[in-house]
Amino acid sequence: MALTSEQKKNVISRYKLHDNDTGSPEVQVAILTERINSLTEHLKLHKGDHHSRRGLLKMVGQRRALLNYLRDRHYERYRALIDKLGLRK
């Protein structure tokens, strides 16, 4: 469910805007997407895990808010990110 530090470093290296970038919206969305995908796989096996389902919904909402922020302020970066991540919209 949780990302290992190695997985997180890989995600950051793929989506960073500059060398020390760990907090840009692109990186945050990419990390959340990895966590969401991992948790989705967990929930396929453990259908009754409602606590994790609530966490998943919170993460999806947080990702949506970050994507809305990026869409409103930097539309080109937003389009590039959704294409790269393969998200709908």
Curated annotation (Swiss-Prot):
Keywords: Ribonucleoprotein, Ribosomal protein, RNA-binding, rRNA-binding. GO terms for molecular function: rRNA binding; structural constituent of ribosome. It comes from the Bacteria. GO terms for biological process: translation. InterPro entries: Ribosomal_uS15, Ribosomal_uS15_bac-type, uS15_NS1_RNA-bd_sf. SMART domains: Ribosomal_S15. Pfam families: Ribosomal_S15. One of its GO terms (cellular component) is cytosolic small ribosomal subunit. PANTHER family: RIBOSOMAL PROTEIN S15, BACTERIAL AND ORGANELLAR, SMALL RIBOSOMAL SUBUNIT PROTEIN US15M. One of the primary rRNA binding proteins, it binds directly to 16S rRNA where it helps nucleate assembly of the platform of the 30S subunit by binding and bridging several RNA helices of the 16S rRNA. Belongs to the universal ribosomal protein uS15 family. Part of the 30S ribosomal subunit. Forms a bridge to the 50S subunit in the 70S ribosome, contacting the 23S rRNA. This is Small ribosomal subunit protein uS15. It comes from Pelotomaculum thermopropionicum (strain DSM 13744 / JCM 10971 / SI).
